[in-house]
């Protein structure tokens, strides 16, 4: 089984590549990553010599680069590649629109042309907006993104569903809550809080500080992604969480 992982040098992508190579001895992984500010190639240093792992530097929003990497016979694509930092999306939405929407479109177009057997799109629960206190979202909930980042991911989700319905692309969408774990980008909340606390710096408070979030350990999410890779229903959307804010 040959799997293309986009954004595999990022936090969740790198953890998933390591998980998949360890869990499945019959899987070959191609890591396709632009290596932006959030990438951490060192997170994959321990598997770089694995004969079942290869790396290709490229941009998912570049049609020619995507077309080239799709020339090998792929069994699945898992799209982790994304601009994900909410504050950065507020400062400048343009990179988020390019990568998260146009990049996803390039991948879907290639999947359509090559009749890819499986396309997993890694989305986020932020496409739903803010839930009322004590309530959670189902997969049928209305999308109500509240930031340029969330809006770009919601648009990408709609594209994935449209390609599944219109062209028969065997696509699945996973919407996960916040992850934490090894190799997480230091600007993210938990690493930032820990670093600031260790250095006796102030801890950032967002809004009134009373928000509740569901946090999921990244290796548990990797297990869920691997499960979806094997068993998810084409065209389906799955929420993934720990279920414990």
Description of each model-found segment:
Residues 65, 106-109, 215, 220-223, ...:
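Conserved mid-core alpha-helix of short-chain dehydrogenase/reductase
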Residues 47, 135, 186-194:
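A glycine/serine/threonine-rich, flexible loop-to-helix segment
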Residues 173, 215, 245:
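Short aromatic/basic micro-patch
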Residues 1-179:
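N-terminal Rossmann-like NAD(P)+-binding domain of SDR-like oxidoreductases, especially those catalyzing
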Residues 49, 167-170, 194-205:
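A short C-terminal helix-loop "cap" of Rossmann-like NAD(P)-dependent dehydrogenase/epimerase domains
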Residues 154, 179-192, 199-201, 205-206, ...:
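Glycine/proline-rich active-site loop of Rossmann-fold NAD(P)-dependent oxidoreductases
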Residues 111, 164, 197, 228-229:
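Hydrophobic pocket-lining residues that define ligand/cofactor binding sites across diverse proteins
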């Amino acid at each position: 089984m040959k799997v293309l992982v986009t954004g595999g040098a990022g936090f969740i992508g790198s953890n998933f590549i390591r998980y998949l190579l360890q869990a499945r001895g019959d899987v070959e992984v191609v890591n396709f990553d632009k290596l932006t500010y959030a990438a951490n190639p060192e997170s994959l240093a321990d598997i770089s010599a694995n004969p079942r792992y290869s790396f290709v530097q490229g941009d998912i929003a570049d049609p020619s680069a995507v077309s080239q990497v799709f020339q090998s016979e792929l069994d699945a694509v898992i799209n982790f590649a994304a601009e994900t930092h909410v504050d950065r999306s507020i400062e400048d939405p343009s990179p988020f629109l390019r990568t998260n929407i146009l990049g996803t479109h390039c991948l879907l177009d290639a999947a359509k042309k090559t009749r890819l057997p499986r396309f997993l799109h890694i989305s986020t629960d932020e496409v739903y907006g803010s839930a009322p206190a004590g309530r959670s979202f189902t997969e049928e909930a209305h999308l109500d993104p509240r930031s340029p980042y969330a809006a770009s991911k919601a648009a990408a989700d709609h594209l994935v569903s449209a390609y599944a319905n219109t062209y028969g692309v065997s696509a699945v969408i996973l919407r996960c809550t916040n992850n934490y774990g090894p190799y997480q980008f230091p600007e993210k909340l938990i690493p930032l809080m820990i670093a600031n606390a260790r250095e006796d710096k102030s801890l950032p408070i967002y809004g009134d500080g009373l928000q509740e979030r569901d946090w999921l350990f990244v290796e548990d999410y990797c297990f869920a992604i691997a499960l979806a890779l094997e068993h998810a229903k084409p065209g389906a959307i799955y929420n993934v969480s720990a279920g414990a804010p």
